[in-house]
A protein has these predicted regions:
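Conserved active-site histidine-acidic residue motif and adjacent donor-binding/catalytic loop
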Residues: 53-64, 76, 94
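Short beta-strand->alpha-helix junction loop in the catalytic core
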Residues: 1-10
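An anion/phosphate-binding loop that grips the pyrophosphate of nucleotide cofactors and donors
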Residues: 68
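Nucleotide-activated donor-binding/catalytic signature segment of Leloir-type glycosyltransferases, i.e.
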Residues: 41-56
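Catalytic binding pocket for nucleotide-activated donors in carbohydrate/polymer assembly enzymes
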Residues: 77-142
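A short, well-ordered alpha-helix in the C-terminal region of glycosyltransferases
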Residues: 136-157
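Glycosyltransferase donor-sugar binding loop
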Residues: 27-37, 54-57
């Protein structure tokens, strides 16, 4: 997973020229609600440090999540992201649920990753608050992501 705060650069040798290629953080967005999706698109379109991919069909969820550095979405997209040890920001029909962390995992899971806990349908949220969550997402450790993934497996087997 790429660190948002660090510039990740790779080099390649091509025709006697050394080329530096900036690696952007890949954010996969899986939001069904069109109004909420537009709000997220507005923020991410203004952020050149991200490569953003929007899920358009259920059949591509797994492949895109594997390639992602961060998932923004709700429902099955968020669930799959956590299961595959990716940082997930829950944004759905019930607003901004925020970054899924070991402290918030159980309540988000019980809320089916639909948005803010006890949120209202079509609840609004500020783009600034989403931006803060994106920056926090890249500080989760592999151990934290693994722990939440293991919890999903445990809950499935109950």
């Amino acid at each position: 997973m790429k660190n948002f705060n660090e510039l990740s650069v790779t080099s390649s040798y091509k025709e006697s020229n050394l080329q530096l290629v900036e690696q952007k953080a890949c954010i996969v967005v899986g939001i069904a609600n069109p109004r909420i999706k537009i709000r997220v698109e507005v923020l991410l379109s203004e952020s050149p440090e991200y490569q953003t991919i929007y899920i358009s069909s259920g059949s591509e969820i797994g492949k895109l999540i594997e390639e992602a550095d961060l998932i923004i979405g709700s429902g099955i997209t968020a669930y799959e992201g956590v299961a595959r040890r990716k940082p997930v920001i829950v944004v759905g029909d019930y607003g901004l649920g925020g970054l899924v962390t070991p402290d918030t995992f159980r309540s988000q899971y019980n809320n089916r990753f639909k948005g803010r806990i006890n949120g209202m349908k079509d609840e609004s949220f500020s783009l600034e608050s989403l931006e803060k969550e994106i920056k926090k997402a890249f500080s989760l450790t592999f151990q934290e992501l693994q722990m939440m993934s293991n919890q999903i497996i445990t809950y499935q087997n109950i």
